[in-house]
From Swiss-Prot:
Keyword entries, A-Z: Cell inner membrane, Cell membrane, GTP-binding, Hydrolase, Membrane, Nucleotide-binding, Protein biosynthesis
Pfam families, per the entry: EFG_C, GTP_EFTU, GTP_EFTU_D2, LepA_C
HAMAP family: LepA
EC category name: hydrolase
Entries under Gene3D superfamilies matching the protein: 3.30.70.240, Elongation factor 4, C-terminal domain (3.30.70.2570), Elongation Factor G (Translational Gtpase), domain 3 (3.30.70.870), P-loop containing nucleotide triphosphate hydrolases (3.40.50.300), Translation factors (2.40.30.10)
Cellular localisation: Cell inner membrane
Keyword check for Cell inner membrane: yes
Domain tr-type G residue range list: 2-184
Family: Belongs to the TRAFAC class translation factor GTPase superfamily. Classic translation factor GTPase family. LepA subfamily.
Organism: Tolumonas auensis (strain DSM 9187 / NBRC 110442 / TA 4)
Stated name of the protein: Elongation factor 4
InterPro entries: EF-4, EFG_III/V, EFG_V-like, EFTu-like_2, G_TR_CS, LepA_C_sf, LepA_CTD, LepA_IV
Example of a GO biological process term: positive regulation of translation
C-alpha cells in the first residue's frame, strides 16, 4: 500500500489536463506507441469534436521512480467546465492528492480556483504544475506569484513542464511520488468500496468504477450493495491502463472496475458503498452530496412512437451521468415526453446530443427554466420548474427567483465591459479585489440570467479572458410573470416562459416577431399574441395567402366585384373558425435563441 498514489488532475478549461494525461500514460508505458493517440482518455466522439472532457476517466500506471521502487499510480482525468464540476468532486473523493495544472501563459482562472478549493476542503495535497512553458508568451514567474496570491498555496517551487513536448514531465511524476501521501485504510478490515462512477455495457451489464477504502475484493466474492441490500457475485474485475485489463483482486487503496452482472440500471448507484455479503462492513462510506439541477427543460420525441426507446435511453444515460434528473411530462402541443433537470446549458446541449447520437432519437426541447419558489396565499411554499405549473396569479402571495453567486476573474482592461454586462443581467456587486493585473469580482445575479447565455456573453465582451464560476445562493422575491404565446387565440403550453416583468413587453415583442417569420402562411390570417394573464402585450399577424378572384372580371360592374370579394371573405372566415395551425419544429428552437441575436 505504501507504493500506491491516487490523484486527480484538475484545471480550468483548455489548460492541458488531457494532454498531460497522455504524456503520463506514454512515460509509464500504459499503451504501446501504436495505440497512442491525442487525448486518449476522451473516448466519446462528442469529447473529441468539441475538444473538451465530459466524463472523468481513470487510469492505473506503474512508474519506476528514481529511488528504484515501482509505484502504482491511479489517476483520474477530470473535466474543466463549470457544468461538470460534480464529476470533479466525485473524482476527488477517491484520491489523496490533486495536480493543479495552470497554463503558464493564461494564469489562474475561476475554475482553477473553484476546483482547487474543493480539493482543499477534502484535505487533499494539492501539487501545482505550470504547463505550456514552451509557449513564447509563457510567464512562469508571474503565474507562480498569481497562484500564491489568489489561490494561497506555495508555488515558488512548482514543477514547470510542457505536456505537448514532454519537457519536465518526469519531474511531475517524481513530485507525485514525493508529495502525495499513500492511501490510508486497513487491508484486514471488512470490505468498503466506494462507487465513483458507473456505466452500462451492452454485454456486461452495469460496470462500476470503485475505490477500495478498506479490505480487498477478489473475483467470485459475494458482494452486497449497501443502499439496496441486494447481493451479487463478482464476475470480473480489473484496472484500466486505459485498456480494460482483468486482475484477480483489487487490494486496499486501489482504484479499479467491477462487473457483477447487474442488469438493472439502478442496481449500483454512484456514491454507494459495496461490501461483502458475509461479515460485511456495518456502516456505509459517506457518499457525495446530491447535486441539484439548476435548469429544467422538456424533452419530447418528434414521433410519439419513440417514447419507449426514449425512456430506455434516458435510463441508461442517467446511470452514467448521476446529475441528470427526469420525470414524465405531457404537453398538449408536443405529446408525451420528459421534464429533465440539468446543471447548466452546456450540460443540456451535451445530453441532448448524446441522446440523438448514441440512441438515434429525434428530440424537441422546450425553453429552459430555473426553479422558482412560490409562497401561496394560504402560506404553503411550493417549488416549480415549469411555466405550465405556475398557479393562478391570485393564488400567489410572493414569487421568489433563485440567485446565483458568481465569481468572475477578469483582466483589468476588460473590467468595464464585464461590469456593464453584470448590471444588464440585474446583478448586484458584493465584492471586488485586485490581484496584480487580474480583478476578482463577486456578483449576485439571478440564476435565470446566468444559465441562459451569460457565459457566452462574458467570453465575448472580454475576448475570452474572463472566467466564471457560479453556485446557488438563495431565493429572493422578484417581480416575475408568465408570458404565454397564443396562436389564433389558443395558448400553446410549450411556448410559455417565465420572465421579469420589466423585460416582458420586450421579450413578448421579440417572440411574436420571431414566430411570425417561422409559422408558414395559411389560407387565413393567423394572429400571434403574447399575453400576461388576460392582458395582451404584443401581437402580429401572419397574412393569409389569397387568390385573385377579380382576375376574370374585365371592366365590369363594381357590384359584381364586391360580390366575388365578399364571397371570398366569407370562405376565409369559415376556414378560420375550423382551421388548425401546426407550429413547426423551428419555432420551439427559436424560443431558445431569442435575445441572443441582439
Amino acid at each position: 500500500m505504501k507504493n500506491i498514489r491516487n490523484f486527480s488532475i484538475i484545471a480550468h478549461i483548455d489548460h492541458g489536463k488531457s494532454t498531460l494525461s497522455d504524456r503520463l500514460i506514454q512515460m509509464c508505458g500504459g499503451l504501446s506507441e501504436r495505440e497512442m493517440q491525442a487525448q486518449v482518455l476522451d473516448s466519446m466522439d462528442l469529447e473529441r469534436e468539441r475538444g473538451i472532457t465530459i466524463k472523468a476517466q481513470s487510469v492505473t500506471l506503474d512508474y519506476k521512480a528514481n529511488d528504484g521502487e515501482t509505484y502504482q499510480l491511479n489517476f483520474i482525468d477530470t473535466p474543466g467546465h463549470v457544468d461538470f464540476s460534480y464529476e470533479v468532486s466525485r473524482s476527488l473523493a477517491a484520491c489523496e492528492g490533486a495536480l493543479l495544472v495552470v497554463d503558464a501563459g493564461q494564469g489562474v482562472e475561476a475554475q482553477t480556483l473553484a476546483n482547487c478549493y474543493t480539493a482543499l476542503e477534502m484535505n487533499l495535497e494539492v501539487v501545482p504544475v505550470l504547463n505550456k512553458i514552451d509557449l513564447p508568451q509563457a510567464e512562469p514567474e508571474r503565474v507562480a506569484e498569481e497562484i500564491e496570491d489568489i489561490v494561497g498555496i506555495d508555488a515558488m517551487d512548482a514543477v514547470r513542464c510542457s505536456a505537448k513536448t514532454g519537457l519536465g514531465v518526469d519531474d511531475v511524476l517524481e513530485e507525485i511520488v514525493k508529495r502525495i501521501p499513500a492511501p490510508e485504510g486497513d487491508p484486514d478490515a471488512p470490505l468498503q468500496a466506494l462507487i465513483i462512477d458507473s456505466w452500462f455495457d451492452d454485454y456486461l451489464g452495469v460496470v462500476s468504477l470503485v475505490r477500495i477504502k478498506n479490505g480487498s475484493l477478489k473475483k467470485n466474492d459475494k458482494i452486497k450493495v449497501m443502499s439496496t441490500g441486494q447481493t451479487w457475485g463478482v464476475d470480473r474485475l480489473g484496472i484500466s491502463t486505459p485498456k480494460q485489463k482483468d486482475t484477480l483482486a483489487l487490494n486496499c487503496g486501489e482504484v479499479g472496475w467491477v462487473v457483477c452482472g447487474i442488469k438493472d440500471i439502478h442496481g449500483a448507484p454512484v456514491g454507494d458503498t459495496l461490501t461483502l455479503a458475509k461479515n460485511g462492513a456495518e456502516s456505509a462510506l459517506p457518499g457525495f452530496k446530491k447535486v441539484k439541477p439548476q435548469v429544467y427543460a422538456g424533452l419530447f420525441p418528434i414521433s410519439s412512437d419513440d417514447y419507449e426507446s426514449f425512456r430506455d435511453a434516458l435510463e441508461k444515460l442517467s446511470l452514467n451521468d448521476a446529475s441528470l434528473f427526469y420525470e414524465p411530462e405531457n404537453s398538449t402541443a408536443l405529446g408525451f415526453g420528459f421534464r429533465c433537470g440539468f446543471l447548466g446549458m452546456l450540460h443540456m446541449e451535451i445530453i441532448q446530443e448524446r441522446l440523438e447520437r448514441e440512441y438515434d432519437l429525434d428530440l424537441i426541447t422546450t425553453a429552459p427554466t430555473v426553479v422558482y419558489e412560490i409562497v401561496q396565499t394560504d402560506g404553503t411554499i411550493i417549488h416549480i420548474d415549469s411555466p405550465s405549473n405556475l398557479p393562478a396569479i391570485n393564488n400567489i402571495q410572493e414569487l421568489r427567483e433563485p440567485i446565483a453567486e458568481c465569481n468572475i476573474l477578469v483582466p483589468q482592461d476588460y473590467l468595464g465591459n464585464v461590469i456593464t454586462l453584470c448590471i444588464e443581467k440585474r446583478g448586484v456587486q458584493t465584492n471586488m479585489v485586485y490581484h496584480g493585473n487580474q480583478v476578482a469580482l463577486t456578483y449576485e445575479i439571478p440564476m435565470a440570467e446566468v444559465v441562459l447565455d451569460f457565459f457566452d456573453r462574458l467570453k465575448s465582451t472580454s475576448r475570452g479572458y474572463a472566467s466564471l464560476d457560479y453556485g446557488f445562493k438563495r431565493f429572493d422575491a422578484a417581480d416575475m410573470v408568465r408570458l404565454d404565446i397564443m396562436i389564433n387565440g389558443e395558448r400553446v403550453d410549450a411556448l410559455a416562459i417565465i420572465t421579469h416583468k420589466d423585460n416582458a413587453p420586450f421579450r413578448g415583442r421579440q417572440l411574436v416577431e420571431k414566430m411570425r417569420e417561422l409559422i408558414p402562411r395559411q389560407m387565413f390570417d393567423i394572429a400571434i399574441q403574447a399575453a400576461i394573464g388576460n392582458h395582451i402585450i404584443a401581437r402580429s399577424t401572419v397574412k393569409a395567402m389569397r387568390k385573385d378572384v377579380l382576375a376574370k372580371c374585365y371592366g365590369g360592374d363594381v357590384s359584381r366585384k364586391k360580390k366575388l370579394l365578399n364571397k371570398q371573405k366569407e370562405g376565409k372566415k369559415r376556414m378560420k373558425s375550423v382551421g388548425r395551425v401546426d407550429v413547426p419544429q423551428e419555432a420551439f428552437l427559436a424560443i431558445l435563441h431569442v435575445g441572443k441575436d441582439n
